[in-house]
């Protein structure tokens, strides 16, 4: 955990730093109290990153360029458009959020596409 944040900051676990990851960013944010900002409002215009959030525990309220998403434990929220302004607030103490981000084009899968012919995609309808 990163020590020394502001009193109203969530606990920050820099997974990318801990494991020395270089292909994508990964962090876990844990709310000390309810109504605590887990992800400050921002966009990724400068970096071009796509971001994926997974609620590990508790519940969070996401705001995505004006749209609101209520996410409970096990919910994933994907933000593929870097221009979308995003933020997340914990709805309960102990809410834990995994955040993963990477710039477009930095990942090439080694999986065989035929394994997924029967697996639906979020953007398929």
Question: Model regions: which residues?
Answer:
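A short, N-terminal "cap"/entry segment at the start of jelly-roll beta-barrel domains
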Residues: 1-36, 41, 116, 120-125
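Short, surface-exposed beta-edge/turn micro-motifs
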Residues: 23, 49-52, 94-95
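Residue-level recognition of conserved beta-strand positions in structured domain cores
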Residues: 28, 56-57, 64-66, 90, ...
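Short, conserved beta-strand element in jelly-roll/cupin
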Residues: 45-62
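Short, conserved secondary-structure segments in the cores of folded domains
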Residues: 51, 67-68, 87
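Short beta-strand His + acidic residue motifs that chelate non-heme Fe in jelly-roll/DSBH
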Residues: 62-63, 79, 85-92, 108
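Short acidic-glycine-tyrosine-enriched beta hairpin
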Residues: 65-83
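Double-stranded beta-helix
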Residues: 89-125
